[in-house]
Amino acid sequence: MDFLGNYDVVVVGAGHAGIEAAHAAAMLGAKTAIFTLTLDFIGNMPCNPSIGGTAKGHLVREIDALGGLMGIAADATFLQSRMLNRGKGPAVHSLRVQTDRKRYHMWMKHALELTPNLEIHQAEIVRLDVQNGHVCGVVTALGGYYSCKCVVIATGTALGGRIFVGEAHYDGGPDGTHAATALTKDLTAHGVPLRRFKTGTPARVHRRSIDFSKLDCQPGDPDELLQPFSFMTHKPMHNKVDCYIAYTNPETHKVILDLSLIHISEPTRLALI
């Protein structure tokens, strides 16, 4: 192994959780490194590019109050902002925005690059160096070694990821990335209990192929009513696009019921951290 650096904190994964963990540690003065499989997926939102909503919107504001990045990033990159549950009492009003996922990624990447005490590495972590019950460092797929005082695992769906498309299934992560299978095996070897959760993502539909006249338009709130997530956002905010609602029908129900008879093998119990 080649010794490549020494840090107080190493964060594995640069999604929502990893970004906030690395940023918080660095801002508190810890020499921090964040590792990601690819720099192009920092803050990537491959499934649903929205921030906030019921319960989750509360969490975004708490992160912002603690000096986090998600709220201000959402304010800077949103396409549509809408306060949910306006027909109910104010206690359940929930702010939700649809973001421009590419701009969100670029905003987050730039923010991390400007964070003092923080270094970004594009590398796959395959093994933890554990000595006498304590983590002393991490090892990359290319044999690089980084010593550290603690490690934050924030790998999300990359850890032991498996993709199911109909009856086909293969190892992989979101948006064509590969699964971090080596780290999964290493954590198992260290006695870490692992469990895999399952999610479903609908196929993307090309905008030009949609007949929007058949859908219900759902505009965002008027600009004068828009509220930011972040206490640090002071610029005027403007909605840019409408959203649309579609409904299922007996034909789509039949497709779902017919496909429900297809048996997919039991997923391996892997980790989602």
Regions flagged by a language model, labelled:
Residues 262-273:
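Single conserved hydrophobic/aromatic residue that forms the stacking wall/gate
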Residues 20, 62, 266:
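Acidic-residue sensor for enzyme active/binding pockets
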